[in-house]
Amino acid sequence: MQGNALTVLLSGKKYLLLQGPMGPFFSDVAEWLESLGRNAVNVVFNGGDRFYCRHRQYLAYYQTPKEFPGWLRDLHRQYDFDTILCFGDCRPLHKEAKRWAKAKGIRFLAFEEGYLRPQFITVEEGGVNAYSSLPRDPDFYRKLPDMPTPHVENLKPSTMKRIGHAMWYYLMGWHYRHEFPRYRHHKSFSPWYEARCWVRAYWRKQLYKVTQRKVLPRLMNELDQRYYLAVLQVYNDSQIRNHSSYNDVRDYINEVMYSFSRKAPKESYLVIKHHPMDRGHRLYRPLIKRLSKEYGLGERILYVHDLPMPELLRHAKAVVTINSTAGISALIHNKPLKVMGNALYDIKGLTYQGHLHQFWQADFKPDMKLFKKFRGYLLVKTQVNAVYY
């Protein structure tokens, strides 16, 4: 990939935009591309997609993912697009599009949540996360010159806009479901289920403000540098399904707690951080309580919600993750890191390469000179200073 992420994004002439984030972002991107002299066509797959493309012309796809390559082939004869854009490269329709584009020599660019949040979003040619084309060889980065620090506008994504757009997306998807009978969403697509989860998430957040108000001061003082931080991801994260050996987050919790009970220093603690976007969907307290008893961990396990990640990282001794982008944040804080899945930053010298059993007492620190080179390259090649909401 040549040039920076924005240059790569703009190097096409005719664009086909598939499914984007819930909301108007991909419609806005299409209009932006057209304002720069490119051609851009949106494809809608459900009522939510169509609702957010209602102010511009679009193409509708009504078939199954298996039939998508044939549809793309026929479309390409009429509209010879040279670039496909999508959000996330693990959705069934996007997987089919990626395979077809690769065979035809057509550029496939995937958007994703920012690797370096919150001021950035990710755009990569060929794939994102563990499908990224970024080199995994540490010597590649060590030989790089220092990257100039780009100007960064201090953007902050709006949680309320995200919720509002999600609400309308799910409602329109349900309202027009009979017009897209073969569409299958990559996650739950019921507005009523999601609404219940969001209401539950709100009340749990208020509850945790009370029940966990003393936890962070304890971690910052009494347990400073005495705890390992295990980061949880959302239960239906495609990065777990596609880029790890785990079938469920619960399998990860079990493995980490078992290993910690057997090999970690007896005076250490394990802090398990729940993902804030999963607050209304899943709760692991019964599982963690049962495993704590089974593995004889007693009071050495702390299960936390909604505590600020920078503070948790700053006071942690080390960090374990499946493949969350929180792993990059751990490296920013110069913390020893063990990756249990596949991640683009799981590079020798940055992360611990041995078994989890040995990690707890390993004399390992990330090479921060290497990380500086890696982060600079990552920023220039994959990040765009923007937000989705």
UniProtKB/Swiss-Prot annotation:
<dbReference type="Pfam" id="PF05159">
    <property type="entry name" value="Capsule_synth"/>
</dbReference>
<dbReference type="GO" id="GO:0000271">
    <property type="term" value="P:polysaccharide biosynthetic process"/>
</dbReference>
<dbReference type="GO" id="GO:0015774">
    <property type="term" value="P:polysaccharide transport"/>
</dbReference>
<dbReference type="InterPro" id="IPR007833">
    <property type="entry name" value="Capsule_polysaccharide_synth"/>
</dbReference>
<keyword id="KW-0625">Polysaccharide transport</keyword>
<keyword id="KW-0813">Transport</keyword>
<protein>
    <recommendedName>
        <fullName>Capsule polysaccharide export protein KpsS</fullName>
    </recommendedName>
</protein>
<keyword id="KW-0762">Sugar transport</keyword>
